Amino acid sequence: PPFFFNDTATTVSYTLSLHDALPISTRRSNHMKLMDKAKQAALAAAVKTGLGYLEKDPEVNIPKLMELVDKFVPDGWYESQRNAIRNAIQNKDSNWYKLILRIYELDPGVREAFFTNFIINASLKGSALQEETAEENNCNVPWAILLDPTSACNLHCTGCWAAEYGHKLNLDFDTICSIVEQGRKMGTYMYIYTGGEPLVRKKDLMRICEKYPDCEFLSFTNGTLIDEEFCQEMLRVKNFVPAISLEGSEEANDGRRGEGVYQKVMHAMELLKAHKLPFGVSTCYTSANVDSVSSEEFFDHIIDCGALFVWFFHYMPTGNDAVVELMPNPQQREKMYHKIREYRSTKAIFGMDFQNDAQYVGGCIAGGRRYLHINANGDVDPCVFIHYSNANIYENTPLEIGRAHV
């Protein structure tokens, strides 16, 4: 399952680690391919049936979920992960049990679309097709494609790498659709918008969600453009999840992002929670805000606001005029390493540490190994933080770019 727990049931492995990081040149026999497809089909059936079972009475049926999964999945398949999940969800005092209950407070249609697209399409069905495509073409196939719909932004945050591209670049609607069309053929059903501020293009983004209801779309956003009308659109399309930038207390947040931004973010979260829509928080930690974002108060606050996940990135100076003073020092990074893990095992929110959780995803995931990045000019980067490109989406397809080992 995509969010499978490790053997201690205190942390969660990223969905990106569903299949092991084997060399692309590794070849499997037809028998093994059939076995893998059988596993994927069995898991998909188990997940689909299990989700329907949970809908009837989540609080009563969550502890019984693995009994149902066991009926579909043969002995020995993902056994340690299944046992770890079983141990976690049978404890009603565990943070994971509480997080699952929070998910069942969401709008039912949105929740069903998320489970179907994220678990079945992106992580089970998609994984099998990704592996098959990778072997046939001797290349990496990404689990997720990150793309910048626009370089435009309505804020001017200190140290933001996106500003180095200016504010006039855009991937047009047809180009984004083409990327999604080609990605689906490779088994990629997860698309993540970066920027710029993606919601500058929110009408186009909703049209894309509507056109590809079998894909899940996540967007990093400053949250200031989320309003009542947009919440209604999210309810309509059902497959869009915002990750809202928040960097601690009001003072810490507005010190880098601008005066008044914190209150606008609070308003956006209130709207999303009121409409029972899923969202998370994206936090860039710097030398200036480490104490704020590592505090228990910060975690409790974003949980109260309705966030289901929080994704941490440490500040990385990029570009000629980057503010290097904001880089966290080694002691601050170590502090965040331990704090994120502490709260991940105790709080009803899924915490992720982009730079320091490499152990759960087999190391670096860039270069199409699990993801790649397409900027608003169409340039394809191996990583959102590494702005070097030898390919452009206007000149090559994603598969051709993968074959070139970008």
Spans of features found by a protein language model:
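Exposed loop/turn and edge beta-strand positions of beta-sandwich/beta-sheet ligand-binding modules
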Residues: V12, W143, G368, V384
